[in-house]
């Protein structure tokens, strides 16, 4: 076993340390199969991945029982891992103008042939929704040296077999809003709308949107004469061209 493999096993041992005896060993073997890439060949199938990793039938059954009936919680493992990273002191959070970014996004394990599961998530490679088990991920953005490395903070799993991507997105945003600290800003990809972020009451955020996006102020313009305004003034973050004419961006309120 190489030095890197030994160090990986030592970290896994520390992560599962709070878990009851027996279950901790089974979870360690399961996580080792995940890290080794054995789940890729079996498309996420647990028994196939464990068999590919060289575990015996008895060990495979023990891992399966620990996964679905063991006395453990994913947040215990995440907390233990974060404490290990903090004690190691190599990972450092990214800070921009005294703000710490926290990434919030969705991902999925694609299982097109999984029986009894109807939930679908958008697959960017296929450019359409495909059957898969969706997850919401919340992670601190940091780096080890010059390499950017996210530090997992929370996982939001789909609750039901038919849960929609929109519902999972909403629960993930609500979770992120509760976990966001005073000096943190949530970072979102283009898959989430500004309305969803506001409904989750996230106080500070940066969200990727279309280059031609526009919005409206939440206050009505000052009444001068004529018909009264029903909507706020249009705000255009970026200038754009239309029919050969340049539409200027809205002036900033402050810098």
Where are these regions (language model features)?
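An internal, acidic/charged active-site-proximal segment
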Residues: 156-255
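A generic secondary-structure signal
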Residues: 52, 84-88, 172-179
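Active-site-proximal, Lys/Arg-enriched surface segment
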Residues: 36, 67-146, 242-255
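Gly/serine-rich nucleotide phosphate-binding loop at the start of the catalytic core
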Residues: 1-68, 74
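Short, conserved acidic/polar surface loops in the N-terminal third of protein domains
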Residues: 111-118, 149-150, 197-199, 217-218
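Generic alpha-helix structural propensity
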Residues: 41-45, 58, 62, 72-80, ...
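Electropositive, glycine- and tryptophan-enriched low-complexity nucleic-acid-binding patches
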Residues: 59-65, 124-183
């Amino acid at each position: 076993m190489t030095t890197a493999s030994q160090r990986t096993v030592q970290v896994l041992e520390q992560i599962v340390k709070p878990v009851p005896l027996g279950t901790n060993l089974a979870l360690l073997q399961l996580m080792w199969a995940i890290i080794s890439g054995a789940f890729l060949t079996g498309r996420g199938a647990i028994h196939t991945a464990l068999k590919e990793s060289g575990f015996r039938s008895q060990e495979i059954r023990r891992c399966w029982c620990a996964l679905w009936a063991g006395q453990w919680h994913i947040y215990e493992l995440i907390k233990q891992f974060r404490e290990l990273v903090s004690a190691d002191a190599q990972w450092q959070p990214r800070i921009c103008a005294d703000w710490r970014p926290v990434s919030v996004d969705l991902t999925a394990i694609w299982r097109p042939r999984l029986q009894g599961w109807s939930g679908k998530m958008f697959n960017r490679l296929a450019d359409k929704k495909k059957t898969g088990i969706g997850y919401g991920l919340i992670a601190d953005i940091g780096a080890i040296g010059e390499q950017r490395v996210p530090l997992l903070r929370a996982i939001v799993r789909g609750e039901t077999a038919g849960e929609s991507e929109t519902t999972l997105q909403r629960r993930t945003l609500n979770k992120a809003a509760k976990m966001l600290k005073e000096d943190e800003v949530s970072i979102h990809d283009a898959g989430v709308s500004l309305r969803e972020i506001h409904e989750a009451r996230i106080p500070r955020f940066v969200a990727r949107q279309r280059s031609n996006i526009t919005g409206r102020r939440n206050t009505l313009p000052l009444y001068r004469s004529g018909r009264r305004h029903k909507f706020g003034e249009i705000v255009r973050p970026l200038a754009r061209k239309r029919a050969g004419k340049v539409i200027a961006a809205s002036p900033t309120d402050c810098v």
